[in-house]
Amino acid sequence: NEYTAFGTALHTVCEDLLTEHVNKDVDESELFTVEFRKEIKKLDVELRKDMIVSMFEQGKKIAPITIPYLQEHFGKFEVFATEEKLYEEMEGLGGYLFKGFIDLVIKTEDNKIHIIDYKTCSWGWGKQQRSDKMIAYQLVLYKHFFCKKYNIKPEDVETHFCLLKRTAKTNIVEVFSTTSGPKRTKNAIELLATAVKTIKNKIHIKNRLACTSGFGCEFYRTK
């Protein structure tokens, strides 16, 4: 949909600004416009024209300030990787592999490694999203398998979400850091293992929300 296209376009621009366009005089807003048009053309759904017009303007505001914000927030850094691919074996699960892509990995002057995941959103994240352990577990697992891949000490790696806010008037770009210590890592790995075993054993958990009108059940509130 439009939201996915918007997020993909911004991700691409942020990646390109730190790789092929680094230290070049480029128009970030124009880069976004080009990428967003590409993504829109791929959509095989009816588009809301008013939303598309708004997204063009919103993206053109976000694109020029994202990388400068990261540079201000983290200080001088070098890019370790963009779109870092993880394809690592999950211990004790019979050869199953963890697959993921980290948006951005940087190394700061204090020799810390920072794993960053871009999240496009409307006005930002509320308290519930910021405290949601399931959201945080994404980065926790990224860190665990990244450290395993490169044999890096976990204490040398920090994790962050970079919020790119479409409709916010202020703080349009924000870095939100998450904890990823030993206890949280252990909990995330255990939850992942449980999920894999559940799927492997073909155990299907009933979705009780499917019994509501929101899911279009034809028998909702019938005898």
Regions found by a protein language model. Give the residues of each.
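RecB-family 4Fe-4S metal-dependent nuclease core
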Residues: 1-223
